[in-house]
A protein has these predicted regions:
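N-terminal leader/linker segments that initiate helical-solenoid repeat arrays
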Residues: 21-72
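Residue-level recognition of tetratricopeptide repeat
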Residues: 79, 113, 147-148, 182
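TPR alpha-solenoid repeat register
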Residues: 82, 116, 150-151, 185
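Register position in tetratricopeptide repeats
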Residues: 92, 126-127, 161-162, 188-198
Length: 202
C-alpha cells in the first residue's frame, strides 16, 4: 500500500453551476473594480465558500461550517456537488467515515456524478479497501469524471500496488494521453521498462 498513500492528495472538488451560487448581485462574481463607487464585495454564499475550501484546503473547519449551512438550505441547487466538497473537507480533517457518507449522499442526489465515485475510491484506498476502490474508480471513469487523468492515475496506482503491472502501465499512459504534462503519471512511467514478449529480463 506504499504507493497508494500518495492518492489522498488527488481528491476532486465539484463546482456548482453559477445559478447554484448566485450570491448578491453586487460583487458576486468578484469583479476587478468596485461597482458604482461601492466597496468591493466578495461572494459569501455558503456553497461557494464550501467549494473554495475543498479546492484550496485552507481553513478547513471554517469551510466545513459553510458546507453544513449549504446542505441544510432547502432552496439550494446542486446539493450533490456540495456533498462532494464537504466530503473532501472531512477527508482532509481525517474523518474518513464522514467523507464516505458525504460521497454516498452525493450519489443519492446525482447517481451520474463521476467525481463522487472517484473521491469515494480515494477514501476507500486510504481505508485499505482496494477492491471496492477499483470498482468505484471504474464507475467514475464510465461516468466521465471531471479530471479523467486523475481517475486513470488512481486506477493505475491501485493496479500497481496489486502487482497488475500491465494494467498499471496502460492506465499511467492513458492519464498522460489525456493530460500530457501530468507529472505524477510521468514519474511513475519512468519506473517501467517495456520489452518484447518472451524476452528475458535482468
Amino acid at each position: 500500500m506504499k504507493r497508494l498513500a500518495l492518492l489522498g492528495a488527488l481528491l476532486v472538488s465539484a463546482m456548482a453551476a453559477p445559478s447554484a451560487i448566485a450570491g448578491p448581485q453586487l460583487g458576486g462574481s468578484m469583479p476587478d473594480k468596485p461597482i458604482d463607487n461601492l466597496t468591493m464585495i466578495y461572494a459569501t454564499d455558503p456553497a461557494l465558500q464550501c467549494y473554495n475550501t475543498a479546492r484550496e484546503g485552507a481553513d478547513l473547519k471554517f469551510g466545513l461550517e459553510h458546507c453544513n449551512t449549504a446542505v441544510l438550505d432547502p432552496m439550494m441547487n446542486y446539493r450533490a456537488e456540495t456533498f462532494v466538497n464537504r466530503g473532501i473537507i472531512r477527508y482532509d480533517l481525517g474523518d474518513h467515515s464522514g467523507a464516505l457518507n458525504d460521497f454516498n449522499n452525493a450519489l443519492e442526489y446525482n447517481p451520474a456524478l463521476g467525481d463522487a465515485y472517484l473521491n469515494q475510491a480515494l477514501v476507500l484506498v486510504a481505508e485499505k479497501r482496494p477492491s471496492e476502490a477499483m470498482a468505484a474508480v471504474n464507475q467514475g471513469i464510465a461516468l466521465g469524471a471531471t479530471n479523467l487523468q486523475v481517475a486513470y492515475y488512481s486506477r493505475a496506482m491501485i493496479a500497481d500496488d496489486a502487482g497488475q503491472y500491465a494494467q498499471a502501465y496502460r492506465d499511467y499512459r492513458q492519464a498522460l494521453k489525456i493530460k500530457p504534462d501530468y507529472a505524477p503519471a510521468q514519474r511513475q512511467l519512468e519506473r517501467f521498462k517495456v520489452v518484447p514478449k518472451g524476452t528475458a529480463t535482468q
